[in-house]
Amino acid sequence: MQYRHEWKHEISVFDVLCLRIAGGGITVNSCSEGIESPEIFIEDGDITVTSTDDGINACGTETADGSLPGVTINGGTVTLLNPSGRDADGIDSNGNIDINGGLVYISLVGDGSNCALDYGSENGGVCRINGGTVVACGGSTMLETMSETSAQPSLLYAGATQAAGTEIALQDTDDKTLLTFAAPNSFSAVLVSCPEMQLGSTYTLTLGAISQEITLTQVADSYGVSGGTGQGGSPGLPQKGLTPPIDSDFLSLL
C-alpha cells in the first residue's frame, strides 16, 4: 500500500491471506480491529491506528503455507492507540511477532487486561525484537516478555499505574537520551527497546518524575512486581494471566 487514507469502520484494513504495507500513510481514526490478516508485513510507511480492540491482529490458526500467523515489522513508524478498550492488545498474533526495524509506539489504557504485545506462546509462537525502537505501554494483567532469541535487548517494567501523558525516557550513563515517548493513555506496564541497548550496560528508566538506574543482565530483561516469571523474564514478574498488585511505588520495586 502506498497511499494515505483515513478509515472509520469495524475492521479497517483486512486481507484473507497476507497483507503487506510498503509505504505511504494509513490513519485509522476509529475502529474495532485495526489491521488484520493471518500474515502482516510492514516494510515502511506512517501508520496510526486508534481502536477499541486490537490495533494489529495476525488472526487464524495458520497461514497459506501452513506456518503460524505472524506480524513482521521491518521499518516505518507504527503508532497504536486504544483509549477505551478492554481485553484488547496493541499487536496481537496467534503466532509470532518479529520487530526488525522502524519505530513502534503502543499506548493502551492500563486497566482491564489490555496487553501491548500479545503473541501465541501457547502455540509455540515467539516475540522477537531484532532492531528498531519500541515503546509499548499497556496493562499488567496479561504480561509476556520478549523471547530470549531476540537479537536486541528489551526491558519490561510492571508496577504502579502511571497517569495519561506520563513521559517515558531511557538514558545511558552519558546522559544521552536513547528514546522518549509521552503515553497518551494511563499504563501499568511498559516495554522499551532500541538499538543502542547492550547487555551489561546501565541505563536510567524515567517515568514522569521518578527514575531508576537498571543494568541489563539478559536479552529479555524485566523489573517490577513480585510474583511468577513471565516468558523469558527475570523473577519478579507475574505469569501471563495473573493480576499483579499495582499500589507499590516504582522506586521500591527496583
Model-derived segments and their meaning:
Residues 1-254:
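A composition-driven surface/loop motif
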